[in-house]
UniProtKB/Swiss-Prot annotation:
The keyword Transmembrane applies. One of its GO terms (cellular component) is endoplasmic reticulum membrane. Its main location: endoplasmic reticulum. This is Protein Frey. One of its GO terms (molecular function) is protein-macromolecule adaptor activity. The chain crosses the membrane at residues 13-29. Keywords: Endoplasmic reticulum, Membrane, Transmembrane, Transmembrane helix. Interacts with SPPL2C (via active sites); the interaction stabilizes FREY1 protein and inhibits SPPL2C proteolytic activity. Interacts with IZUMO1; the interaction retains IZUMO1 at the endoplasmic reticulum membrane and coordinates IZUMO1 complex assembly. GO terms for biological process: fusion of sperm to egg plasma membrane involved in single fertilization; gene expression; maintenance of protein localization in endoplasmic reticulum; protein N-linked glycosylation; protein stabilization; protein ubiquitination; protein-containing complex assembly; sperm-egg recognition. It is a single-pass type II membrane protein. The gene is FREY1. It comes from Bos taurus (Bovine). Residues 64-90 are annotated as: Disordered. Key regulator for male fertility expressed transiently in round spermatids where it recruits IZUMO1 at the endoplasmic reticulum (ER) membrane and coordinates the oolemmal binding multimeric complex (IZUMO1 complex) assembly. Upon complete assembly of the IZUMO1 complex, its ER retention is released, facilitating IZUMO1 complex export to the acrosome. Through the interaction with SPPL2C, inhibits its intramembrane protease activity directly accessing the catalytic center of an I-CLiP.
Amino acid sequence: MVLAMLGALHPRAGLSLFALYLVLAAALLRPQPLRPQRAVPEEFSAPLELSAPLSGLVDDYGVRPKHPWPRGPRPLLSRAQQRKRDGPDMAEYYYDSRL
């Protein structure tokens, strides 16, 4: 419709737009080449097992993550700086008090 309106106004512009339309239609209707079924060749596939065992949990940058649990026993009285005569800390007995 637009081509017809442009052709009515300027015959050469309508003809060049029609030629452009034909080129685009031919390019879009041309069959696309089929993609290969396997994107990665067989010689590049990774082995199923690691050749060497992991020496530790290390991320991509070589940094070992910090674990939330401390190493060794936790001294409860020295951590809270309590004395035995102060009585037990009731917040430590209920696991849902810190949530």
